[in-house]
C-alpha cells in the first residue's frame, strides 16, 4: 500500500517562505559560508572519516532512481527493513518524491510513505517541513540523523553504512538498481522482522529500528557546506540540537555517546508500554551554586545507568494519512495520537520543591516516582538551531489542563548553560504551551496540578526555536498579542519575579543579575540571526538598516542596534500596542530620519547590492562566489588582490552608469565625487567584508609557501636582540604604556575590512610613534630618516604576519582614484620597514629605504595609475551561473563580458565541466519549468538581465546539457524552442 505524506500541518503556510538572511542584525560573520563545520558526534557509524553525505553522494545510483515508477519502488521497499528509502521523480508533476518503507505490526499492512520534495529556486524541502536544503544529498543526509516530520529517521542499507573506503562505495554504486537484489543486500536484512523504533513521533505505529547494530567508537555525521552558490540557509545535521536517537537498551553506548542515568520508570502504564520504549527526557540544567530550596529529597543510589544519546523532540506535524495504532485518550479528542505509556519528567535543578509537591498527590505508580532521579551531567554547548521557513508551529493544547501542559513542557526543558538555548533569549511566548510552562515554574500555581495528576500523559510539544521565541519583539498579529496577554494574566506574582530574557527553568536555577542576563540574551548570535528571519516570515520590516546577508556590518553598528533596554510587558492590551510602537523597526525608522543624505544613500546602495532580485545585487553575489574560486587557484598575492580590485572597480563603474542607482539618487543632493565615494564605501562593506577572512587566509598561504613569513619571523628575533643604536635609532622609543596603545591600534587595523579605515588607523599609529620620538627632545623636528628605524623597532615588537597582510591588503585593494597624500607616504614607509626587516643585515644597517624597496614602491605607484586609467574605459565583466545536466546540479559561476555570445559561453562550459563531446552540448534556459535553447548568437547576459527585471519575478536557470536529452523534459520530450532575443516569453 502506498500512502502520500507530508502535507502542511494546520496553521502552517502553504508554501515556503523565501530564503531570509538580509538583516544586518543576523550577521554571524559567515562570509561566503567559509566556516568549517564543528565536529560533534552522534550515533551513526562513521568509518575512516567517510561522512553520511559522502556516502550518499557516492552511492546515489542506488537510492536516487528518477526513472522508476511507483509500483517498482513499492516492490523494492516492501522487501527491505523499515526506514529504507528511494527517491524517484513523479512523472506527472516532475517533482522528486521520497519513498520510505513504513511497516506496521502486521507485516501484511506494510506501507510505503511518499513525501513530495518541493523545489523553489535554489532550495529543496519536504512538503510541510520548515527546513530547507541546498540539494537532495544534504536533504537525505539530514533525515538520516533527524526525522523532523518523518515518523523516524531514514536508514541506509547496511552495506553502505559499513563501507570503510571509497572503493567499497564505488563497488556498491556500480551495481545501481541491481544492488537491492544483490548479495550485498542479504536476504536476512531484506526479510528480517520489524521491531519498534527507538525514535519515532507520537501517533505513529511501530516500525523496525532504524539504528544500525554495528558498534563504532568513532561515529559522526558531517555535512560540509560548499562554496560557490548564493544560497543563504543550509541545514547541517551537526548543527541540529536533536540530531540522533537513543541506542537500543541492550547494547552498550558508543565511545563518544556517554552513558547517562535514566530517570526511574513506571510499569503502571497501558499494555502498549511493554513494547514501546520510552524516550528519556532531556538532562536538567546545571545545579546552581546556591540551591533555591534548602531541603532536597534523598537520591536513590541504586539506579542503574543506561546508555542514552540525545533524542530529537517530537514534531507537532504528524503524517496525515497514517492511522495510529495507539489513539489518544477519549477525554482529549483533539490531541494528536500518542502512546499511552507514562513519561516521568526529569528533575530540574532549582525545581526540587516543585517536583516533590507534584509527585505527592495523585496515583503514583511506583515508589521511585516520589524521589527525583540523580541529576544528569550537564551537556556541552548546543549548536545553533537550523533555519526555519515559518514563524511558529501551532500545537493544539487548549483542551488540556494547565497541569498536564506544564508536565509536557517539563519534558523538553533544555539544559542550563547552553549558549543558544531558549533560556538565553527573551521569552515572550505566543503559544499556549509556553504559557503553561511559565506557570510550571511558579510554586504558587502548583495546587492546580493534583487535579490532573491521574490523566494520561501528554506528549511534549516540539521545543520552540529561537526564531519563534522572538516573535513578541516585533509587531505581531492581534491574536498573538491576545494570547501573550492571557499568558501574563494567568501568571501569579512571586517574591522573585521572572526576569525577561530567561526561561522559567533558568529563572529558578540561576543567580545572575537581571542586567547580565539581558545583555547576554541580546548578544547571542541566535538573537541576531532569528530577528530578520522572523520578521520576513511575518511580512514585517525589521529594521530600516543595512540588510546584509553576508555579515557586512561593523561591530559598532551591531552593538548599537541591540543596546536599547528591553520593554517589560504587563498583562494588558495597551502594552501590546506599545510593544508594536516601540519595536526595533519603529526605533530604527525614527533614527533613520536623522541620518545625513550621504548616509541614507549609502544604506540604500548596500540594500541594493544584496537584493538578489536586482541585477546589480545578483552581480555582486556572483562576483563574491567567483572571487572565492579565483583565490583558490592563485599563486601570486599581487595578482590575486589586483583581480579583486579590478572587479570592484568594474562593479562601481557599472553601478554609477546604471538606472538602478539613478532611481535612488537626487542629483541636487549628491555631486559626482560624493557619489563615487559612497558607492566605493558600500562595495567595501558588501564585497570586502565577507571576503576579508578568505583573502587573509589565501595571503597567509601564499606567503607561507614563498618563505616570506618564515624569513620575517627569523629576522624579527634578530632585531629584538639588537640594540636601538645598532638599529640606527637616534631618538626616544615608545615606552611600555605607549607601546600598548600602538599595538591596540595595530589590532584594530587588522580587524577593519575597509582599506581606507585601515589607512586612517595607520596614520593615527604613526602619530603616536612621532609623539614618542619627541619626548626626549621636545620641539625638534624629525624626518623620515629618523622615523624609519623607530618604525622598525615598533614593528619588530608587533605581529609581523598580520602587518604584512594588512600592508598588502591596503596597497592593492584601495581605490586607485583615491588621492592618499599623507596616507600614501606612511603606507609606503611601513611597507619599506617590513622589507627591511625581511632582508635585515646587521652589517649594512641603513636609515633609508634600499634601492630595491624604492623600485618596488615606484612599480606600485605606476600600477595604481594604470588601473585608474584602465577602469575608465574597461567593460564590466559579468557573471552567470550555469548548471550541468540538471538545474542546481554542479553549478558553476562563469565570468565573461556582457556582450559574450552563447557559443563562446558554451566553450567556457565545456572546459569548466570537462565534457567529452562539446559539439553535442548546448546552453538552455529553464523558465518556470519551460525549457528554451539559446541560439549560438544569443546574448545570455541580456536574457539574464531581462528575466531579472521581468514582473512578476520568474524562476529561471541556465543549464548546459546535451542536445538529445537531460534537463527539463527528459529524453522523450519534444525539442526545445530556440530563442535569440531576450523577450522570447
From Swiss-Prot:
Compositional bias per record (Basic and acidic residues), positions renumbered to this chain: 189-201, 424-442
Organism of provenance: Homo sapiens (Human)
GO MF entry, a single one: GTPase activator activity
Gene that this sequence comes from: RIN3
Function: Ras effector protein that functions as a guanine nucleotide exchange (GEF) for RAB5B and RAB31, by exchanging bound GDP for free GTP. Required for normal RAB31 function.
PANTHER family tied to this protein: RAB GDP/GTP EXCHANGE FACTOR, RAS AND RAB INTERACTOR 3
GO terms for biological process, alphabetical: endocytosis; negative regulation of mast cell chemotaxis; negative regulation of receptor internalization; regulation of vesicle size; signal transduction
Protein family: Belongs to the RIN (Ras interaction/interference) family.
Pro residues bias locations: 278-288, 315-336
Protein name (record): Ras and Rab interactor 3
Annotated spans, Interaction with RAB5B: 587-732
Amino acid at each position: 500500500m502506498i500512502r502520500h505524506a507530508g502535507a502542511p500541518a494546520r496553521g502552517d503556510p502553504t508554501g515556503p517562505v523565501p530564503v531570509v538572511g538580509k538583516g544586518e542584525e543576523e550577521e554571524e560573520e559567515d562570509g561566503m559560508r567559509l566556516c568549517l563545520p564543528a565536529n560533534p558526534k552522534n550515533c551513526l557509524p562513521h568509518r575512516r572519516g567517510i561522512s553520511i553525505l559522502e556516502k550518499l553522494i557516492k552511492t546515489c545510483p542506488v537510492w536516487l532512481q528518477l526513472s522508476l515508477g511507483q509500483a517498482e519502488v513499492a516492490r523494492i521497499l516492501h522487501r527491505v527493513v523499515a526506514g529504507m528509502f528511494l527517491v524517484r521523480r513523479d512523472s506527472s508533476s516532475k517533482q522528486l518524491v521520497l519513498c520510505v518503507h513504513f511497516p506496521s505490526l502486521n507485516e501484511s499492512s506494510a506501507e510505503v510513505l511518499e513525501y513530495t520534495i518541493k523545489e523553489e529556486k535554489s532550495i529543496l524541502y519536504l512538503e510541510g517541513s520548515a527546513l530547507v536544503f541546498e540539494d537532495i544529498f544534504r536533504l537525505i543526509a539530514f533525515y538520516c540523523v533527524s526525522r523532523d516530520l518523518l515518523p523516524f529517521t531514514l536508514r541506509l542499507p547496511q552495506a553502505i553504512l559499513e563501507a570503510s573506503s571509497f572503493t567499497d562505495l564505488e563497488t556498491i554504486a556500480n551495481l545501481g538498481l541491481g544492488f537491492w537484489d544483490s548479495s550485498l543486500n542479504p536476504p536476512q536484512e531484506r526479510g528480517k522482522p520489524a521491531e519498534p523504533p527507538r525514535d519515532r513521533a507520537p501517533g505513529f505505529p511501530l516500525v523496525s529500528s532504524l539504528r544500525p547494530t554495528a558498534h563504532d567508537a568513532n561515529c559522526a555525521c558531517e555535512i560540509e557546506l560548499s562554496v560557490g552558490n548564493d544560497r543563504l540557509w543550509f541545514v547541517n545535521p551537526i548543527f541540529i540540537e536533536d540530531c540522533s536517537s537513543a541506542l537500543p537498551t541492550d547494547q552498550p553506548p558508543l565511545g563518544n555517546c556517554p552513558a547517562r542515568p535514566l530517570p526511574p520508570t513506571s510499569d503502571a502504564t497501558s499494555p502498549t508500554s511493554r513494547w514501546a520504549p520510552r524516550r528519556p527526557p532531556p538532562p536538567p540544567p546545571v545545579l546552581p551554586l546556591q540551591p533555591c530550596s534548602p531541603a532536597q529529597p534523598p537520591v536513590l543510589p541504586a539506579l542503574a545507568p543506561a546508555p542514552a544519546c540525545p533524542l530529537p523532540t517530537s514534531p507537532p506535524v504528524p503524517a496525515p494519512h497514517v492511522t495510529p495504532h495507539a489513539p489518544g485518550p477519549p477525554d482529549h479528542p483533539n490531541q494528536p495520537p500518542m502512546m499511552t505509556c507514562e513519561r516521568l519528567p526529569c528533575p530540574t535543578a532549582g525545581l526540587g520543591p516543585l517536583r516533590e509537591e507534584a509527585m505527592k498527590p495523585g496515583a503514583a505508580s511506583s515508589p521511585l516516582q516520589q524521589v527525583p532521579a540523580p541529576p544528569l551531567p550537564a551537556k556541552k554547548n548546543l549548536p545553533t538551531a537550523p533555519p526555519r521557513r515559518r514563524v511558529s508551529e501551532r500545537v493544539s493544547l487548549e483542551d488540556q489542563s494547565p497541569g498536564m501542559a506544564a508536565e509536557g513542557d517539563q519534558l523538553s526543558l533544555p539544559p542550563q548553560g547552553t549558549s543558544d538555548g531558549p533560556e538565553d533569549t527573551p521569552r515572550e511566548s505566543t503559544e499556549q504551551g509556553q504559557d503553561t510552562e511559565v506557570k510550571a515554574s511558579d510554586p504558587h500555581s502548583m495546587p492546580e496540578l493534583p487535579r490532573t495528576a491521574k490523566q494520561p500523559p501528554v506528549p511534549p510539544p516540539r521545543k520552540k526555536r529561537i526564531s519563534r521565541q522572538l516573535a513578541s519583539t516585533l509587531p505581531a498579529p492581534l491574536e498573538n498579542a491576545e494570547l501573550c496577554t492571557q499568558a501574563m494574566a494567568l501568571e501569579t506574582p512571586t517574591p522573585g519575579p521572572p526576569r525577561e530574557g530567561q526561561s522559567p527553568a533558568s529563572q529558578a536555577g540561576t543567580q545572575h543579575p537581571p542586567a547580565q542576563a539581558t545583555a547576554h540574551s541580546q548578544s547571542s548570535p541566535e538573537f541576531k540571526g532569528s530577528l530578520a528571519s522572523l520578521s520576513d516570515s511575518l511580512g514585517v520590516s525589521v529594521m530600516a538598516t543595512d540588510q546584509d546577508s553576508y555579515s557586512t556590518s561593523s561591530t559598532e553598528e551591531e552593538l548599537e542596534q541591540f543596546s536599547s533596554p528591553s520593554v517589560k510587558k504587563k498583562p494588558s492590551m495597551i502594552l501590546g500596542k506599545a510593544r508594536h510602537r516601540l519595536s526595533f523597526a519603529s526605533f530604527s525608522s525614527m533614527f533613520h530620519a536623522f541620518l545625513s543624505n550621504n548616509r541614507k544613500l549609502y544604506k540604500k546602495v548596500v540594500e541594493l547590492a544584496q537584493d538578489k532580485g536586482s541585477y546589480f545585487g545578483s552581480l555582486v553575489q556572483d562576483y563574491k562566489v567567483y572571487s572565492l574560486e579565483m583565490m583558490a587557484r592563485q599563486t601570486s598575492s599581487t595578482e590575486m588582490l589586483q583581480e579583486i580590485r579590478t572587479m570592484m572597480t568594474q562593479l562601481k563603474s557599472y553601478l554609477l552608469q546604471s538606472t538602478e542607482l539613478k532611481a535612488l539618487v537626487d542629483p541636487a543632493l549628491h555631486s559626482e565625487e560624493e557619489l563615487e565615494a559612497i558607492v566605493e564605501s558600500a562595495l567595501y562593506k558588501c564585497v570586502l567584508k565577507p571576503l576579508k577572512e578568505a583573502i587573509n587566509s589565501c595571503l597567509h598561504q601564499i606567503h607561507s609557501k614563498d618563505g616570506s613569513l618564515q624569513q620575517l619571523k627569523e629576522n624579527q628575533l634578530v632585531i629584538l636582540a639588537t640594540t636601538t643604536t645598532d638599529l640606527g635609532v637616534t631618538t626616544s622609543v615608545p615606552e611600555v604604556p605607549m607601546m600598548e596603545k600602538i599595538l591596540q591600534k595595530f589590532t584594530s587595523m587588522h580587524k577593519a575590512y575597509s582599506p581606507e579605515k585601515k589607512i586612517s588607523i595607520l596614520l593615527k599609529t604613526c602619530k603616536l610613534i612621532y609623539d614618542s620620538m619627541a619626548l626626549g627632545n621636545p620641539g625638534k623636528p624629525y624626518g623620515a630618516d629618523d622615523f624609519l628605524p623607530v618604525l622598525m623597532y615598533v614593528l619588530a615588537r608587533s605581529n609581523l604576519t598580520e602587518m604584512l597582510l594588512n600592508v598588502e591588503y591596503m596597497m592593492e585593494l584601495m581605490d586607485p582614484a583615491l588621492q592618499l597624500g599623507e596616507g600614501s607616504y606612511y603606507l609606503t614607509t611601513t611597507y619599506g620597514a617590513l622589507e627591511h626587516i625581511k632582508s635585515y643585515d646587521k652589517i649594512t644597517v641603513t636609515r633609508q629605504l634600499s634601492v630595491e624597496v624604492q623600485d618596488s614602491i615606484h612599480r606600485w605607484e605606476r600600477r595604481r595609475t594604470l588601473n585608474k586609467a584602465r577602469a575608465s574605459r574597461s567593460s564590466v565583466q559579468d557573471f552567470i551561473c550555469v548548471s550541468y545536466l540538471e538545474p542546481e546540479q554542479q553549478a558553476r559561476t562563469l565570468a565573461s563580458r556582457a556582450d559574450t555570445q552563447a557559443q563562446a559561453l558554451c566553450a567556457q562550459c565545456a572546459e569548466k565541466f570537462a565534457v567529452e563531446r562539446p559539439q553535442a552540448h548546448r546552453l538552455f534556459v529553464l523558465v518556470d519549468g519551460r525549457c528554451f535553447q539559446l541560439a549560438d548568437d544569443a546574448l545570455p547576459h541580456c536574457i539574464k538581465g531581462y528575466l531579472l527585471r521581468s514582473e512578476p519575478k520568474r524562476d529561471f536557470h541556465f543549464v548546459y546539457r546535451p542536445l538529445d536529452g537531460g534537463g527539463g523534459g527528459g529524453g522523450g520530450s519534444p525539442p526545445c524552442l530556440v530563442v535569440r532575443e531576450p523577450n522570447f516569453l
